Amino acid sequence: MKKNLHIISRVLPDSIGEELELEPGDALLSINGQPVEDVFDYRYLMNDEFVTLLIRKKNGEEWELEVEKEYEDDLGVEFENSLMDEYRSCSNHCIFCFIDQMPPGMRETLYFKDDDSRLSFLQGNYVTLTNMSDYDLDRIIKFHLSPINVSFQTMNPKLRCKMLHNRFAGDALAKVDRLYKGDVTMNGQIVLCKGINDRDELEYSLEKLSEYAPVLQSVSIVPVGPVS
C-alpha cells in the first residue's frame, strides 16, 4: 500500500485541530501508527476515544500528538484532497461513452472518466468493477460502504467485454457475488443499446440480476443517446 501525504487546507474554529495548533500546510502522516490510505481509513482510525497523531509541520518538524476525545469526534480539519487519495480512472472504452461524445473546449475535469468505488459511495457515481481489486472489495465490506452503484450493461460476460472494449469486463461480474455475500447494498444500471444488449439479452440480464435481490435494490434502464 502506498503512503499518501495528507495536507491540511483548513482548520475549523473551536475544533480539536485548532486546540492542537494544527495549521494549513501541515501534513497528517499516521493515526495510531497506521498509515492513512484515504478518507475511509481516516474516519475508521479516528473513531476512537484515544488516538495518536503523527503530524509533519510546515517547517519539517514532526509532532506526535496524543488526543483524548469523544468516540465520534473529528479533528475538525479539511484536507487539500477530500478523498485523501488519487481518483481512479476508467480503463474501459465503452461503445456508448458519453464523455467521448462531449465537445472540445470545456472544463478539463469534465473529461475525466472516473471508475472509483469510493466515489460510488460518496457521490453516487456508477462503477464497472473492472479496476476493482480483491483488496478494494475487502475494504468495501470492512467499512460497510454501501450502496455501491454498478454499471452492469449486460450479464453476458462475452457481450460485456465487447461493449466495454475490455477483455476483463466479463470476469469482473464475479465481484458482484463478493458484494452480495458481503451484504453490500447495490443499485444497478444498464445503458441500453439497440440491437446489442436489448430484447433477449436484456431479459437474460434482468433475470440474472434478480437473483441478487434484495441486496441489489434497483436496476435502471438508460436508453443510449449517441450524438455526432
Stretches with model-predicted labels:
Residues 1-12:
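PDZ/PDZ-like groove recognition
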Residues 12-17, 37-39:
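Short alpha-helix capping/helix-loop boundary micro-motifs
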Residues 34-42, 61-64:
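Short, Lys/Arg- and Gly-enriched loop/turn segments at beta-strand edges
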Residues 17, 25-28, 53, 97:
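Terminal peptide-recognition signature
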Residues 19-37:
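Conserved PDZ fold ligand-binding element
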Residues 40-54, 69-72:
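Short, compositionally biased
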Residues 16-21, 43-44:
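Short, surface-exposed secondary-structure edge patches
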Residues 60-62, 69-216, 223-228:
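Conserved Radical SAM active-site core
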